[in-house]
C-alpha cells in the first residue's frame, strides 16, 4: 500500500462512523385534516451554545437605566444645562428614543444562522431544515420535543396549512410535540399560536400549548 492510498483509507475510515450513525430521533406524522405524510429526522440535539442565540432573541429586554438627576440650581447651572443637552446627542442619534429590536426579526436571524440538525420531509423532494432540536421528559411518561424549521411548514403544500395563520410573516415554524415511549403522540405548531420562551425549561415553546389545535398525529 502506498503512502497516499494509506492516507485515503484512513480518511474514509474516520468518516464512516459519522455516516453510519443512527439519527437521534425518527418519527412519522400525518397532518390533521389532510392526507399529508411527514417524516421527522433529527441527526442530533442542539447544544446549549447553539440554542442560546434563539433563547436570547425572546428574552425580556434589560431594564432601561434610570435618568440622571437634574442639576441643582446655582452658579454652575448654565454649564450643567449645556452639558446635558449635548449628552442627549441632539440631532445626531436620538439614542434613548430608538425602538427596541423586533423579537420576531431577532429570532428569524438566529434561526437562519444555526446549523442544520435534521429535516422534516413531506411527499416531495424538498425538506424543511431543522435548526433547533430540544427534548425533555414531560408529564405522564411522555417526552416533550421542540423543533424549529427554517422555513414555514406547508410553504410548498398550502392546501394543508391551517387557517388563519397567526404569524403569516414568520419564515420559520416552531413545532412542539408530546410523544409516549412508543413514539405515539401529537404535534402543534406556531402556525396556529404564538412562540414563547419557556424560561423554566430554557427552551423555545408554544404559548398556550394545551389550548392550541393539534396539527400532527405522530407515530414512530
Go through each PLM region and give its residues:
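Solvent-exposed loop and beta-edge segments used for protein-protein assembly and interaction
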Residues: 19-23, 34, 124, 139-141
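Compositionally biased alpha-helical segments
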Residues: 52-59, 96-98, 108
Amino acid at each position: 500500500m502506498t503512502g497516499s492510498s494509506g492516507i485515503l483509507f484512513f480518511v474514509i475510515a474516520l468518516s464512516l462512523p459519522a455516516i453510519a450513525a443512527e439519527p437521534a430521533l425518527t418519527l412519522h406524522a400525518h397532518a390533521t385534516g389532510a392526507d399529508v405524510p411527514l417524516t421527522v429526522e433529527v441527526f442530533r440535539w442542539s447544544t446549549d451554545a447553539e440554542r442560546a442565540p434563539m433563547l436570547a432573541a425572546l428574552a425580556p429586554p434589560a431594564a432601561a437605566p434610570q435618568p440622571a438627576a437634574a442639576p441643582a440650581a446655582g452658579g454652575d447651572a448654565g454649564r450643567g444645562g449645556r452639558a446635558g443637552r449635548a449628552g442627549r446627542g441632539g440631532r445626531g442619534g436620538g439614542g434613548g428614543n430608538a425602538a427596541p429590536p423586533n423579537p420576531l426579526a431577532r429570532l428569524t436571524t438566529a434561526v437562519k444562522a444555526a446549523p442544520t440538525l435534521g429535516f422534516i420531509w413531506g411527499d416531495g423532494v424538498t425538506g424543511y431544515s431543522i435548526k433547533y432540536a430540544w427534548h425533555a421528559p414531560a408529564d405522564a411518561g411522555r417526552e416533550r420535543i421542540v423543533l424549529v424549521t427554517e422555513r414555514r411548514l406547508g410553504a410548498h403544500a398550502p392546501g394543508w396549512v391551517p387557517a388563519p395563520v397567526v404569524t403569516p410573516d414568520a419564515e420559520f415554524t416552531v413545532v412542539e410535540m408530546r410523544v409516549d415511549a412508543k413514539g405515539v403522540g401529537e404535534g402543534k405548531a406556531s402556525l396556529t399560536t404564538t412562540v414563547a420562551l419557556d424560561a423554566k425549561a430554557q427552551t423555545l415553546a408554544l404559548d398556550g400549548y394545551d389550548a392550541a389545535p393539534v396539527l400532527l398525529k405522530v407515530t414512530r
